[in-house]
Amino acid sequence: MGLSGLPRTGSTLLSAILSQNPEIHAEGNSAVCQLMWDMQCSVYGTATQQLIASDRLDTGIELIKNIPNIYYKDVTASTVIDKCRSWTLPDNMAMLNKYFEHKPKVLVLERPLIEIVRSFVALRQANNYKGDPEEGLLDTWSEPIMRSYEGVKWAKTNNNGEFLFIQYDDLLNNTKSTINKIYEFCELESFEHDFNNIVNKHPENDEVYGMLGQHDIRPTINKRDLDVKLSKEMIAKCKSLS
């Protein structure tokens, strides 16, 4: 099971809520997708000659397939929700379909682009970002927004039941019904969640990203008011992409 979509859309909050269920493991940003991709590039690239010469190509394929099992080897929950914004990219979905029998299911979080940009600008300002806090945020195929944006666009036009799209405001304002939709989509037995005592069981070290507070959540659900003014150029760009 995957958790993907745009950044600043409540993925940490959603993971914390789902993790209240002992049968669900949902942690922070996962390396599984990147590890599988890198191994695939090796098996069908730099290591191909050796694998074929020694009749070990099947071994290489097994290595790719077993990366999720190794990554989550200490997890006892029956369902793992792997969080990575790259799961909506076509090559990564093709990789899931190639190596696993079951049809992949991916939760895709969305939010108006202008709100995402405001959130990142506020985060940069809080971390004393040196330079223009709007700099590079909407550059073509850039991280962390535009690469994810392209993935979400692709998922929307190629959805054959693999993707469940979730709006940020629905997660905040219609939490119970949104969680119920997720359980139905994932074909999981229902669970009574506590939306007034939310704890992040798997906190990330935001120093690695250079953005302290990036994955902070509060024990109750509410939308933070941001006193952020964007430039006219940025507002226009957000509107043109929406």
Indicate where each model-derived feature is located.
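Pocket-edge structural micro-motifs
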Residues: 28, 83-84, 230
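Short, basic, helix/turn surface patches
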Residues: 52-60, 137-141, 218-225
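PAPS-dependent sulfotransferases, especially Golgi type II membrane carbohydrate sulfotransferases
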Residues: 1-2, 121, 153-156, 184-242
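PAPS-dependent sulfotransferase catalytic core
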Residues: 1-67, 201, 205
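PAPS-dependent sulfotransferase catalytic domain
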Residues: 79-193, 208-214
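Short, well-ordered alpha-helix to beta-strand connector turns
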Residues: 21, 77-78
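A structural signal for well-ordered alpha-helical scaffolds and beta->alpha junctions
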Residues: 11, 61, 89, 93, ...
